[in-house]
């Protein structure tokens, strides 16, 4: 009998081998196969697979504020998604008397979440050339039922960015899952798992495209006693902003300097084997257009 771990590993291995441009459809198809299996572990396996695979972010409009926000597993309850602008779920969650209410951050964390959304919206405007969408969601990590009144127990969250070029040839989704662990009254450790989902198409020629995802982790211990911070909450925002900026910078450099250079080496090797000069110039041009596509995101 195939073990649970073997099934999960096989599903993840299959996802890696399928066309990354169709990652959402591929994931849904595999989850459907798992559900149709009808085994006792089907539901758990489906949830683990969904949490292990990053898919392109979906944009939704907040019915109360009219602002767009990004949807992911971290702000989902059933088929509804919580807006960071109004702190309400849309579509409205239909709740029975015996059901638990949808999750919300504590009051103090919600206040920090509001400030974080405003701050990273400015970041998005500066670093994404005024385009795209950003959303930030925080949640309490304290397992006690009492309302959290301070951030002394730490918290977790996710920072999301999505941008698409005007002609649809380039799509960028970045997902930064964060965990904040206070080490002392004046220090905190920040753990960030950053994933980028990239899809670049050459509109002039369908023969060359680049799609896939990249994940990296970063961990730093930072001081909460900052001269520029009015309080601990502001210090957390400054530290998180610095960390996200560093992580995105590293990912962009890795994509452009490593993966695109590798793509060029592969193209050049193939051309030396079977191509001529005109073919080389044509492929160089297509590769250059893909690089420009990344730079425009």
From Swiss-Prot:
<keyword id="KW-0117">Actin capping</keyword>
<dbReference type="InterPro" id="IPR037282">
    <property type="entry name" value="CapZ_alpha/beta"/>
</dbReference>
<dbReference type="GO" id="GO:0030479">
    <property type="term" value="C:actin cortical patch"/>
</dbReference>
<dbReference type="GO" id="GO:0005634">
    <property type="term" value="C:nucleus"/>
</dbReference>
<dbReference type="InterPro" id="IPR019771">
    <property type="entry name" value="F-actin_capping_bsu_CS"/>
</dbReference>
<keyword id="KW-0009">Actin-binding</keyword>
<dbReference type="GO" id="GO:1904600">
    <property type="term" value="P:mating projection actin fusion focus assembly"/>
</dbReference>
<protein>
    <recommendedName>
        <fullName>F-actin-capping protein subunit beta</fullName>
    </recommendedName>
</protein>
<keyword id="KW-0963">Cytoplasm</keyword>
<comment type="function">
    <text>F-actin-capping proteins bind in a Ca(2+)-independent manner to the fast growing ends of actin filaments (barbed end) thereby blocking the exchange of subunits at these ends. Unlike other capping proteins (such as gelsolin and severin), these proteins do not sever actin filaments.</text>
</comment>
<dbReference type="GO" id="GO:0051015">
    <property type="term" value="F:actin filament binding"/>
</dbReference>
<keyword id="KW-0206">Cytoskeleton</keyword>
<dbReference type="GO" id="GO:0031097">
    <property type="term" value="C:medial cortex"/>
</dbReference>
<dbReference type="GO" id="GO:0051016">
    <property type="term" value="P:barbed-end actin filament capping"/>
</dbReference>
<comment type="subunit">
    <text>Component of the F-actin capping complex, composed of a heterodimer of an alpha and a beta subunit.</text>
</comment>
<dbReference type="GO" id="GO:1903475">
    <property type="term" value="P:mitotic actomyosin contractile ring assembly"/>
</dbReference>
<dbReference type="InterPro" id="IPR001698">
    <property type="entry name" value="CAPZB"/>
</dbReference>
<feature type="compositionally biased region" description="Basic and acidic residues">
    <location>
        <begin position="276"/>
        <end position="289"/>
    </location>
</feature>
<dbReference type="GO" id="GO:0099079">
    <property type="term" value="C:actin body"/>
</dbReference>
<dbReference type="GO" id="GO:0008290">
    <property type="term" value="C:F-actin capping protein complex"/>
</dbReference>
<comment type="similarity">
    <text>Belongs to the F-actin-capping protein beta subunit family.</text>
</comment>
<dbReference type="Pfam" id="PF01115">
    <property type="entry name" value="F_actin_cap_B"/>
</dbReference>
<dbReference type="GO" id="GO:1902404">
    <property type="term" value="P:mitotic actomyosin contractile ring contraction"/>
</dbReference>
<dbReference type="GO" id="GO:0043332">
    <property type="term" value="C:mating projection tip"/>
</dbReference>
<feature type="region of interest" description="Disordered">
    <location>
        <begin position="276"/>
        <end position="297"/>
    </location>
</feature>
<dbReference type="GO" id="GO:0044396">
    <property type="term" value="P:actin cortical patch organization"/>
</dbReference>
<dbReference type="InterPro" id="IPR042276">
    <property type="entry name" value="CapZ_alpha/beta_2"/>
</dbReference>
<dbReference type="InterPro" id="IPR043175">
    <property type="entry name" value="CAPZB_N"/>
</dbReference>
